[in-house]
Amino acid sequence: MRVRSLHALHGVFSRQVTPAVDLSDLLRAEVVLGVSALDHYMHELTRLGMLECFAGSRKNTEAFDRFPLPISIAGALSNPSTAQAIIEGEIRSRHSFLSFQHPDRIAEAVRLFSEVKLWEEVGKHLGTTAKEIKTALLLIIDRRNKIAHEADIDPSYPGQRWPIDSNLVERTLDKLQEIARAIFKVT
């Protein structure tokens, strides 16, 4: 994840400046970027999986078969040299406004190319339960949303931000990466 470079930058800066310089917003940016990386990864994995279904190298799922396509592209799909590019464009277009961050949305995306019971299999792969994995991801997403939409302000103490430190961010990034790798492995 590119966000690891930002984490390293925070580490370098924190050793070179006094505590009077608040670097916590770098950490907050890392959380936002980490979730963004998972979202992007899920978009790419879904697009590629759906293209494999279209090409016949992966078994179609019910969700794939129900994926809506405009009638206007029917003619273009009959041309093998352009069909894949047309389908790819439609997938990108239909998914461009969707977010694949919440566990339910991620599972919906995976169902477009795989019949796997996603969170059960991810939990097994990671030696835990589906509930624990989804809860961990939801906590990360909730924190990301507090940062992105609420300026990470603690409503109990107006003007004060929720605490954050390098270890919390490192664990967050590790968990996101662990989940992404497990999703790849089980799909």
Task: Kindly give the residue locations of the regions a language model identified.
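Helix-loop junctions and short alpha-helical segments
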Residues: L33-G34, Y41-I133
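Short runs of predominantly hydrophobic/aromatic residues within well-ordered alpha helices
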Residues: L27-G34, L38, M42, I140
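Charged alpha-helical initiation segments
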Residues: M1-V32, S57, T61-E62
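Charged/polar positions within long, soluble alpha-helices
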Residues: A8, D39-M50, D142-S156, Q177-K185
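Amphipathic, Lys/Arg-enriched alpha-helical patches that create a basic surface
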Residues: R111-K146, Q160-T187
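Non-transmembrane, amphipathic alpha-helical segments
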Residues: T18-E30, G34, T129-E132, R161-I164, ...
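Short secondary-structure junctions and interdomain/linker hinges
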Residues: V3, H10-F13, V17, V116-E120, ...
